């Protein structure tokens, strides 16, 4: 769409009452038409939310647009060609005739923009997935048929997008959330920022989790046959396969010559030992989308105990050889280009990095080490061992109780209840609320933009219904119906968005374009261009719309706290507001019932290997520090704080608490986890260390009686 400078340009705002042009506003604020109606703190909060939004399954375009959405879309993750040229070589990571899927394709091209005296070569890394978070990621969506044009001796067109984020629509708009029917209503579920959400609506916010797991074998250890049978040894799922229901992605067993006769039988190799094996858990049912196997070639030159037993490495060797073949093709291509172009050869930095990595991965042309010398291959300063296996898998993340949602005005809340369609509040005509939030939240937070957005979308819905009624009037011929429908829309635009009305008068002059606009409204409703510098945006503009159209509201039928259906005495509004989901979810717990401890009796520090050694979290994300203790002491008696600190650090108290949790019929209702008559305070290991040092100096601590009786 062509943008005229006299309409959209910043030079036309001076002398106006509202000068909040999108070019004057910062990131985030220029996405909000009601930037001048929200408090500064809530506007800043929404800006911080932009970095917390995952890619969701079924996003939609917002009904009220500022015009910057497509500009945001230009800066999302894409796989695109940077310069004009010709594709020279295409290399797959895993050939499809040998493997089920191929997670990566490398397209090497020669640029045609650097003259004949410079041979500039680059590469496009076409990977099927993107991960920039500890678990949230997304699978790239192919852009049309552009991937089919990636062939040798085919032209490479600058700017051509091969694949992109699923958040972009066909027009390039960045879609972060979903336009949702919201109801602001006082319910027992909406207090304290609670959100009552519709299950079918939450399914639209399903996102993709992508994680990786690593196993290092060969240092007197090996992968057991978790996913194989008597004839095929598989230490992990195949590419394109899924992690089994038990959740174990890989299991590593130490090699013991004395126990090999019982630990390395076909039956024993297929059964994990939950006590002595190093288990690496993933997500049950997750699909493996990438596998990378690294190998230390220096171990091949000597016969030592660090090599994997024969036959056990057949799966690892197959993936390693396929990846090794791709890296050797890169090296062969580089040497071919050197012979062909000599000093005129210039490599794109990313291509240069890949060539360097290929030499390191394949150990190509390396200096032969003397017999008996030890030069070990490392990856990020960690020894590779005989084999280093990296699995990448994906799984669905479905929002649940505990997930956090927010409006584009910083009006966030936490899902506390999920309801079916018949449990959600609704109008008599069947309009169902997708979510229910506190009716006073926008007032208390001073983010009135949330109220204005809901009302504006309600008016747009009413005008859309007027257009549909006109188009169903059989007393008019087709041309008259379209003419009247377009006139209704233009009248609405003149009130709701004068800038959009003026823009359409200048650009949409042909009858066919007007018919096309009416058809788009009939198909998907009204989308308003409503920049934040619109005059009188907010309460004044809403008042004009209400005087002209009247705000349609109805009584709401809802399920009360007694499980009975009730009808509200007052009429209430159910209309669309744009809702985004934040990375806060309900399945990643921050605390644990019992922490993991060292053999010294104090809390253990978790390593990368320990993080996934059990299905759940071993330790809390944060232990109690000085600041937390002082806050607790300000509110609680000192003996309660001492008891809280004693339980995880006192071996006897910790053992008693674990036993109480395991043996309790309902672990959420334990009358007494630690009996202090049997296990008194003072067994904290940290206190015992201090007490021991003081004893060596002739000092002892004891409780003294208070004047009011009892001990202090």
Where are these regions (language model features)?
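Long insertion/accessory domains within large nucleic-acid-processing enzymes
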Residues: 1-712
